[in-house]
A protein has these predicted regions:
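Flexible loop and strand-edge segments within Gram-negative outer membrane beta-barrel domains
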Residues: 2-14, 22-79, 87-110
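Short loop/turn motifs that connect adjacent beta-strands in outer-membrane beta-barrel proteins
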Residues: 26, 73-80, 122-132, 174, ...
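Transmembrane beta-strands of outer-membrane beta-barrel pores
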Residues: 35-39, 74, 87-91, 121, ...
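C-terminal beta-signal and adjacent terminal beta-strands/loops
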Residues: 281-282, 384-393, 417-472
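Structural signature of Gram-negative outer-membrane beta-barrels, strongest in the C-terminal barrel
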Residues: 24, 128-132, 138, 147-279, ...
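Gram-negative outer-membrane beta-barrel transporters
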Residues: 171-176, 271, 276-279, 297-393
Length: 472
């Protein structure tokens, strides 16, 4: 035990509500609000102010958000309208510092607003088949203010995105043909982005569903939440900044799937086979380029790489026996790589990598539930994460290296029992074990020269929990 944390100290409170008002037989107004207060602290000397620690990361979040949604449909259900608006404000006081730095405090404020409307018209027949026509518009606004005076970082970002979308889906019991597209104008991009999509479904028999899909999208060259994080590496702060003339990252995805259902007496079965391929153009990559002008922090720059490809196959199955037993499991094999090796370290002797970091070739999951009596539920679940490569920056170690991690199987058990207290009021008591086999990283860095980003695998070692939930 070196006195430094791998898991943060966490305190959180959440309060919220969701309700609705039926304004008529054919319309409804839904509204919700939530408040989240969260405190996180990691590093060493947790009982002292963060600037008295060798390494400290401390965050105080206050989050308020809410939304309104109004839906209306005609008695014949041919016309449907949905109007929505939501907003969220985040206030954050932070400390990201090393070596008892008094100037590593920061403040962040972020306001996000989304508003839009959607209209759907159902055709009894459109050209050759019944169809649903969907059209809509949406506006996104984000105002970010982030300041860390000790690192000379001052971010002022105002983002406006106006969007319009249109699609038509022809469908009957055997066929479904969807064609549509979306137009986005982002104020940090000098052109309108068109993102088409298409989907073809065919049911040769009732219980077999074949589907071919294409979709596209983009990531804007703006500051994201992960860019506001300051990592500690080798006793120094590490920050992310964007390269000049950074372009948007665009994706093109194709998938082909077969979804099959079958009943065997009291057993219900489902098997899904899917192949997928995604091409990323101007993919975002991070490369260490040295220190800032004041030599206060190491800089990693977000740049455009040439491209990347992700391709793989997923197999997923479900089995249910009455309401007594349910089992679901899936496994995915995929390859994720850049179209050419990308540099990630400023050390010229460190080779560029073609594989994308933190993308295992194999991963999977399973869930199993058993309810011998209605109030009792026994749930067993697990996730498998295959080997992958992660960045390990010098500090505790003498040189930047790409580490090949071991694989992990993380299994959990939860037992719950529901007690009916009064009419619609139920008390649930639960207990269980997380990470039963203690599949956990074994090679954490030690001391104040550590790389705080060198963490992989399951987020918790073996742990035990108990809880209570009141439902009404």
């Amino acid at each position: 035990n070196d006195g430094f944390t791998e898991l943060p100290e966490l305190k959180a409170q959440t309060l919220g509500f969701r309700s609705y008002l039926k304004t008529s037989n054919y319309s409804k107004l839904t509204f919700e609000y939530h408040h989240i207060s969260e405190y996180r602290r990691g590093g060493d000397r947790l009982n002292r102010p963060p600037h008295e620690a060798d390494i400290a990361e401390q965050l105080n979040h206050s989050i308020d958000g809410g939304g309104l949604n109004y839906s209306l449909f005609t008695p014949d259900e041919k016309h449907r309208v949905n109007v929505y608006a939501s907003a969220q404000h985040i206030g954050r006081d932070s400390y990201y510092g090393t070596e008892q730095n008094l100037n590593a405090y920061g403040e962040t404020e972020d306001l996000t607003v989304v508003a839009g409307t959607q209209y759907i018209y159902s055709f009894d027949k459109c050209l050759f088949m019944p169809a649903d026509l969907t059209a809509g518009i949406e506006y996104n606004y984000d105002n970010l203010r982030d300041e860390m005076k000790g690192y000379n970082r001052k971010t002022r970002q105002e983002v406006h995105t106006e969007s319009a979308f249109l699609q038509n889906e022809w469908k009957n019991d055997r066929w479904s043909i969807l064609v549509g597209g979306r137009l986005d104008k982002h104020n940090l991009i000098d052109h309108v982005i068109f993102s088409p999509r298409a989907n073809l479904r065919f049911n040769p028999v009732r219980d077999v569903n074949l589907r071919l899909s294409y979709s596209s999208g983009f990531r804007a060259p703006q500051t994201y939440d992960e860019d506001l994080h300051v990592a500690a590496v080798g006793g120094e702060a590490t920050m992310i900044r964007q390269a000049e003339n950074l372009r948007e990252e665009k994706s093109h995805s194709v998938s082909l799937s077969a979804d099959m259902y079958r009943r065997f007496g009291a057993f219900q079965c489902n098997l899904l086979l899917e192949g997928f391929y995604t091409r990323l153009n101007h993919v975002f990559v991070l490369e260490e380029i040295g220190k800032d002008e004041e030599h206060n922090a190491v800089i990693k720059e977000r740049r455009n790489g040439q491209g990347a490809e992700v391709a793989g196959v997923t197999v997923e199955g479900k089995v249910a026996y009455l309401s007594l037993v349910q089992l679901q499991a899936g496994v995915t094999w995929q390859k994720s790589h850049y179209t050419r090796p990308e540099k990630w370290s400023k050390d010229s002797s460190v080779p560029a990598e073609k594989r994308i970091f933190r993308t295992p070739d194999w991963y999977g999951y399973f869930t199993a539930t058993y309810s011998p009596v209605k109030p009792l539920n026994i749930a067993l679940s697990g996730t498998y994460t295959g080997s992958m490569i992660v960045q390990h920056m010098k500090g505790y170690i003498p040189k930047d290296i790409a580490v090949t991690t071991p694989d992990f199987f993380d299994m959990n058990l939860k037992i719950s029992y529901d007690f009916s207290l009064y009419k619609f009021i139920t008390l649930q008591l639960n207990a269980g074990i997380q990470n039963i086999f203690n599949a956990y990283q074994r090679d954490f860095d030690q001391g104040k020269e550590r790389d705080s980003g060198y963490i992989y695998g399951p987020s918790m070692p073996r742990s035990y929990f108990a809880g209570a939930k009141l439902m009404f």
